[in-house]
């Protein structure tokens, strides 16, 4: 009987993860939502995306525009300006990290024909801070990578991104959403945007994948040539250490290096 428990637990965990992925909702940000199709290879997130192979075939460099909040991102109303800035900064950083492994990152003075990547945060579900402390304490007594989150602590993130060609035509797009799971590897946090910050990396990875030509060759990034070094280290050892010691995700030790920038409000896409 005891040998059957792991077999039963795995499908049950998959059901929990699938339920928490959520259905992505259009955030009135993309230049077009036509042709978006569900991603069937994701368990922990829900996503719709599309790619135009012909439009992506010749892309070698991209210009990343600053991330903004979608016009329908009413959820940001509960966030402080500092929280908004930190979240947008993290999206900028992770998109830069992921895209720079695939393309050359062009600066603000890039030629006008350089494809543009634009992204928006469409939903932010707050992480419950009090319950997160209890979750971390409980996790101390539960060995292994799988943790249990207390109800009321589960945050989430919704976001969209697209690549636009020289004439403003959409070459790739994605609508993405994920919420934390009660049972899984999502770390609790004392930050109200802790879960949202953690989910930026998988969003950026999915967005970059949708924008990548099939025959692309991965680029080699060094500390000296890293176009994203303004955001700090790509992997912060201190963040891993903080999670290992406390069981919590600590933004100050894990997220992108802060910058003195204010959060932006989205404007209509320009061709």
Describe the function of each predicted region.
Residues 21-24:
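Bacterial signal peptide processing site
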Residues 109-166, 242-271:
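Surface-exposed short loop/turn segments
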Residues 145-158, 164-210:
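Short secondary-structure boundary motifs at beta->alpha junctions and helix caps
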Residues 184-271:
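Compositionally biased, intrinsically disordered linkers/stalks adjacent to structured regions
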Residues 1-10:
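Bacterial N-terminal signal peptides that target proteins for export
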Residues 16-19:
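C-terminal motif of bacterial Sec signal peptides marking the signal peptidase cleavage site
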Residues 28-52:
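Post-signal peptide N-terminal segment of mature Sec-exported envelope proteins
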Residues 56-122:
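N-terminal segment of the mature soluble domain
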